[in-house]
């Protein structure tokens, strides 16, 4: 039983599993529902995918690669960049893109990320940099937040599907919450 931090091979397996879950769900979901917005201002599934793609590049694998390339030990002053997620989402305009292409883009990035994570050493986990909003982030911190982040957005995608099904449930709505 793991009671402490998740080791890199476990994180790599969880990252792979998240990608497989996303692929399975989006493959089954009809294309028109990829662009369904459950409420004004909420992301459609394609926008969630775009966010995951950008997070892979800018937030997780990207930051880990920067930290490793710098050889930065935690607290040495390596500055990590923040990014405006809403502005990036608007600029990407993923709602207008093909959902299958977004899934494939994420899958390719994720395969490289899984290899990166699987190859991390114990010494790599304590390396880090300083984020402008949250302060010190180590590779270990990023790995655990990555697992959490994936599941949060998988839940968001699944909730979008639930939101699309809800109005068509008739009396069965009484069995559950919207």
What is the meaning of each model-derived region?
Residues 1-9, 175-178:
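Short, low-complexity, intrinsically disordered N-terminal peptides in bacterial proteins
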């Amino acid at each position: 039983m793991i009671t402490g931090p998740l080791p890199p091979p476990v994180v790599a397996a969880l990252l792979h599993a998240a990608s497989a879950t996303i692929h399975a769900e989006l493959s089954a979901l009809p294309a028109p529902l990829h662009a369904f917005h459950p409420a004004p201002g909420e992301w459609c599934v394609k926008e969630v995918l775009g966010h995951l793609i950008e997070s892979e590049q800018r937030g997780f694998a990207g930051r880990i690669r920067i930290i490793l390339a710098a050889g930065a030990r935690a607290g040495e002053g390596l500055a990590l960049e923040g990014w405006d997620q809403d502005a990036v989402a608007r600029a990407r305009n993923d709602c207008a893109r093909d959902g299958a292409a977004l899934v494939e883009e994420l899958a390719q990035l994720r395969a490289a990320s899984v290899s990166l994570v699987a190859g991390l050493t114990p010494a790599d986990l304590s390396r880090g940099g300083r984020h402008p909003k949250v302060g010190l982030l180590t590779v270990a911190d990023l790995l655990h937040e990555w697992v959490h982040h994936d599941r949060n957005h998988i839940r968001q995608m699944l909730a979008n599907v639930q939101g699309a099904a809800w109005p068509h449930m008739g009396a069965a709505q009484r069995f559950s919450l919207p």
